[in-house]
Amino acid sequence: MKKILKIFVFSLLIFSNANAEERNNKLDNLFIELKKTKNLSSAQAIEKEIQEIWLIHPSDNRRGFRLTELLFQGIRLMNGGQLSKAYELFTQIIATEPDWSEAWNKRATVLYLMNQYESSLDDIKITLKLEPRHFGALSGQALNYIELKQYEK
């Protein structure tokens, strides 16, 4: 499984081996396509492609690859219920790369799963500042407000 994940991450890194401007242009184009499409399966495919781009650190160097590996490790920990360890790992990634929206989003998710809704909202706020179109963060924001019974938000 670990070898498959590394191959997947490496292939995504190669696929998205573009500078930040190219990456942003690709995201812009995907969001335009997403807005225009009327087909559910096309929309889901575009959504998946956007999420895959977000999961890969935008830097095309060894450091970016390592941060991407750490993010996937944190996701595995989170999915395995090791929330404290996942939180620590996402915090480490954020300390190294505070401008990577997906690291903030993943930590917000862990905080939500730990019932720390206000802290999760704080991380979501940063996620959305870095990537205002982050539909996963917007969804997480709604879930946090529901848990806090702040339905008006």
Where are these regions (language model features)?
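Canonical positions in the second alpha-helix
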Residues: I93, I126-T127
